[in-house]
Amino acid sequence: MSSAPPPGGTPSPPPQPLPIPPPPQPLPVTPPPPPTALPPALPPPPPPTALPPALPPPPPPTTVPPIPPSTPSPPPPLTPSPLPPSPTTPSPPLTPSPTTPSPPLTPSPPPAITPSPPLTPSPLPPSPTTPSPPPPSPSIPSPPLTPSPPPSSPLRPSSPPPPSPATPSTPPRSPPPPSTPTPPPRVGSLSPPPPASPSGGRSPSTPSTTPGSSPPAQSSKELSKGAMVGIAIGGGFVLLVALALIFFLCKKKRRRDNEAPPAPIDGVPYGGQQQQNASRRSDHVVMSVPPPKSPSSAPPRPPHFMSSGSSGDYDSNYSDQSVLPPPSPGLALGLGIYQGTFNYEELSRATNGFSEANLLGQGGFGYVFKGMLRNGKEVAVKQLKEGSSQGEREFQAEVGIISRVHHRHLVALVGYCIADAQRLLVYEFVPNNTLEFHLHGKGRPTMEWSSRLKIAVGSAKGLSYLHENCNPKIIHRDIKASNILIDFKFEAKVADFGLAKIASDTNTHVSTRVMGTFGYLAPEYASSGKLTEKSDVFSFGVVLLELITGRRPIDVNNVHADNSLVDWARPLLNQVSELGNFEVVVDKKLNNEYDKEEMARMVACAAACVRSTAPRRPRMDQVARVLEGNISPSDLNQGITPGHSNVYGSSGGSTDYDSSQDNEGMNKFRKVGLETQDLYSNPISEYDLYPSWSSTDGQTTQGKATGNIKRPGQGYG
């Protein structure tokens, strides 16, 4: 019993455990004093029964308990403090430790083993660990001591020493096998001892310091994770900044190399210094052209034909927000959809050296080739006739005008190229050809009425945009079926702005050079050169008549008075409107498969558009709304009977223009056109027999009509 006082001294030993945490192994040495305390712990053994349920393998613990003392250190997490006490017994490697091992062999001996619990310090572990499992934790107090070793042991935790703990020396290392110590708690059932020594509760505080060491390990792991996340975020940010910087520098470099669009002509915006840049650029192109032919020499061409100095029929379609061409030297940012320049090398490579196999069509303007850019995008490359003043004017008009506009029903220019005398325009390729091809091409299936109406509405909207939404307004001057491209969904795209004119808001433009296509020209423009947006309206009316009747604008088989579609249709339009008998004018190929209300709207629009006096014609936005059914066809008449130019109640003709004068001018046009017999005698193609042409004196005496030759199956030229 005298030993009892020593237990009292045991509290002092707890301090020793404190230093032990740093040196994990030293801990076993300090425990020697505690052995005396072992007996006191014996009384509490019975209560520990609660702990045993936690661990099913009691038998193994019995053997292990003696040795676990050291092992408990790993268990700190487990809270089976009972074993820890035993560790102290092993620590006194003196003879006592051997004695303790024997008792562990029998589970019943736990009471004997309880002496090991004397380590009141064991309670210390409870504090380090979670209070919720107090029962087990008390037994684990010793583990707290061991926690300090864990840092070193972590490397070996996998070692199965738990069973070997029988040797006291091993205990320090045994910490890794905390799993084994857990069973000991049952055997010792020493869990009660911790409660028995409440005073030890204070000592646990010291062990608590050791457990603290384990949390740092976890926190360090958390910190390492956080650091990794932070590094990843920081790295991503730095990468984004670097990419942005590279993009900015590249863009800046491109701008330096930019070429301004060609010099303006007839009010087309853009500066004139482009010519110097163009010549310098062409020099570079000559040196870099991979194909055998350099830009200075024209690419291979088909045989020549008579030139008309007119706009061709071709232009490609450009869908909404379409993909831009791949970056190229001199890439420039322009207005609208227009994006920039191409070099001759790119276009030569895209068209396979401007090979004849890639030729889509040819006309007075030059040639059109199909090409494919490096990004796989199909394009149509229009090569304007070299050395032609008309070709240069068309080039300036297209670059200056098309680059300013963007509408889903207007063809947009993708880019252009200037190389020496070469002038090339690049459009997105449209594989479904033109309205003329589908309406008049030989062997073509009959176009359904729904498709015809859809094309009429789309092209009307495109023209309305040019007339109403562009400032200043743009007059196309060459509206015809072959200049309306369609995609596979039969959406219309108005093309070919080579003859387009920027109109003045105040004065009617009077041209000394009448240009357009025979059969589509407005009478006032053909006879006097007076050009307004209503000239486009007349031409569009002719296109509507083609959609309704399926006829061409000029009947080549009738060289007499009524060979014009307009002259034939005008008298019938009034009859159709009064009687509602559309069979007189409707295309027989439709077999009456059409909506009568929609047909009535289109007939009314066509009649209003082809009125002989320009002021009596409707605006294109009105035409588009009537075709869509948004307003009544009667809104187009304004007191005018369809097919006539006179106002109701008026005894005379229109005061704006003399219809007889217009008719006389048109008769002159017919005479000149029909005198050019080769226009009709030579087979140009199975469609598009009516080319654009021009008159140089404002009348028709000097005009020439020539054919735009097109390859079969293609709607370009």
Curated annotation (Swiss-Prot):
Entry comment describing in which tissues the protein is expressed: Mostly expressed in inflorescence bolt, flower buds and siliques, and, to a lower extent, in roots, seedlings and leaves.
Topology Extracellular: residue spans: 1-228
MF (Gene Ontology): ATP binding; protein serine kinase activity; protein serine/threonine kinase activity
Reaction equation(s) it catalyzes: L-seryl-[protein] + ATP = O-phospho-L-seryl-[protein] + ADP + H(+); L-threonyl-[protein] + ATP = O-phospho-L-threonyl-[protein] + ADP + H(+)
Region (Disordered): 1-221, 258-323, 632-665, 690-717
Enzyme Commission number(s) from the entry: 2.7.11.1
Cytoplasmic compartment residues: 250-717
Residue positions binding ATP: 360-368, 382
Extent of Pro residues compositional bias: 1-197, 289-303
Alphabetically ordered keywords of this record: ATP-binding, Cell membrane, Kinase, Membrane, Nucleotide-binding, Receptor, Serine/threonine-protein kinase, Transferase, Transmembrane, Transmembrane helix
GO cellular component entries: plasma membrane
Entry's family note: Belongs to the protein kinase superfamily. Ser/Thr protein kinase family.
Protein name, as recorded: Proline-rich receptor-like protein kinase PERK2
Gene this protein is translated from: PERK2
